[in-house]
């Protein structure tokens, strides 16, 4: 499944003669892929990268899989930091490990609050509307239409009662475009959600529903110098054919960091 998105946004630069010349962003396709994999994957992954960097995005995601407890899908924040610190040609931009929601709130309002927090944790200025629309849709999916995700690998129902539902929900975003420059940014994040409603009702929540929520968020943003791959598509989805730690002498610099 894919949808076409054409950007009409322009930038202007000054030429040698002092005249302005428009820089027109290239059109792009937003493609959603569902592929078989022999590798354990407990993230709801969203990649916003050029094709030659899919390999890198996949293997960064696979690296952070090691921070997830396979028994209960709990995201170990300290383990994630250890993994991040061991990835070459990379740097940690920002981290977050705290409660972010403790209130009775409409889900649509909570989604906007969490989107702003993610923008802050990402630590990069990303101007792509399409990317942020994908982020918003993924956050909505953390709290709505859960009946369609009940058995997915990124969600774990860890405490249920007649008056409360608690679950883990793991997401990973990767972005590489003109805003990130010579690096790829990866943002693994985990929501620990507790809502004062029974599970059967939570499964069918919409963005217009309200409830008492407590949400803890664990996240970090890591950037790694780009290295492209021309591997056949079959090899791209086989982690055994790729080495995340191969030699790369690019230097991480000139990041477009938000304040």
Curated annotation (Swiss-Prot):
Keyword set, alphabetical order: Sporulation, Toxin, Virulence
Keyword Flavoprotein recorded: no
PTM comment, free text: Active after proteolytic processing.
Gene3D superfamilies assigned: Delta-endotoxin CytB-like (3.40.198.10)
Gene Ontology molecular functions: toxin activity
A GO CC term assigned to this protein in UniProt: extracellular region
GO biological process: sporulation resulting in formation of a cellular spore
SUPFAM superfamilies recorded: CytB endotoxin-like
Record's keyword annotation contains Transcription regulation: no
Pfam family, one: Bac_thur_toxin
Function: Kills the larvae of dipteran insects by making pores in the epithelial cell membrane of the insect midgut.
Subunit description: Homodimer (protoxin) and monomer (active toxin).
Assigned protein family: Belongs to the cyt1/cyt2 endotoxin family.
Protein name: Type-2Aa cytolytic delta-endotoxin
Gene that encodes it: cyt2Aa1
